[in-house]
């Protein structure tokens, strides 16, 4: 099994189903508002807000929408969202982490638990699977921004820990603490990245059958479609055949 990493699969799958633009923009706006409320409304001085704005631009969210979401925080938005991390196991014993921003903890927990249960998995306690992931920073550039060698050299100089280059682009991994500085250094050389954010990176991926893979994608679809869910991570990989089918 050649194995496509689950991270790429989820990103491609999410992009496919996120044709529902209003839902996507709503999630992005929520993260922008929360990030601006927790820190300064200036993306240059607020790494989390910077990451949220980059994500919004990657989805072609209108500039007015982005600015409105930032101003909503500055205007004392009365809505308060709790940041919650859910952890559990999906089909095939695959570990899944779900990050959510919700104004109703009970509703979110009930819905997410239901998705896990119906998929044949189960929702666990916080910490039940996160030990199988590393909390790291990732900076992404399109492949045409630099050669693999040039990107590797620049990333090392910027203090990055690892680089993965392919025809799909460059992924530069950093520690949590060095993400912001590394991103600034690379931006000075290659321009604005398409992404710069903290993620949960699996330490190892589990190769699953196509049957289990389809069940996992169904679970991930349900999770990503939930209004409160911001990010989903899992530690599996599927065959090239299923990856092509899911992306098609």
UniProtKB/Swiss-Prot annotation:
Protein name, as recorded: Probable transcriptional regulatory protein OCAR_7305/OCA5_c08120
GO CC terms: cytosol
InterPro entries from the UniProt entry: Integrase-like_N (IPR017856), TACO1_YebC-like_2nd/3rd_dom (IPR048300), TACO1_YebC_N (IPR049083), Transcrip_reg_TACO1-like (IPR002876), Transcrip_reg_TACO1-like_dom3 (IPR026564), YebC-like (IPR029072)
Keyword Transcription (UniProt): yes
Pfam families named among the record's database cross-references: TACO1_YebC_N, Transcrip_reg
Alphabetized GO MF terms: DNA binding
Organism: Afipia carboxidovorans (strain ATCC 49405 / DSM 1227 / KCTC 32145 / OM5) (Oligotropha carboxidovorans)
Tree of life domain: Bacteria
Keyword Nucleus belongs to the record: no
Family statement: Belongs to the TACO1 family.
Any GO BP: regulation of DNA-templated transcription
Location(s), subcellular: Cytoplasm
Classification via HAMAP family: Transcrip_reg_TACO1
Keywords, alphabetical: Cytoplasm, DNA-binding, Transcription, Transcription regulation
NCBIfam families in the record: PRK00110.1 (NF001030), PRK12378.1 (NF009044), YebC/PmpR family DNA-binding transcriptional regulator (TIGR01033)
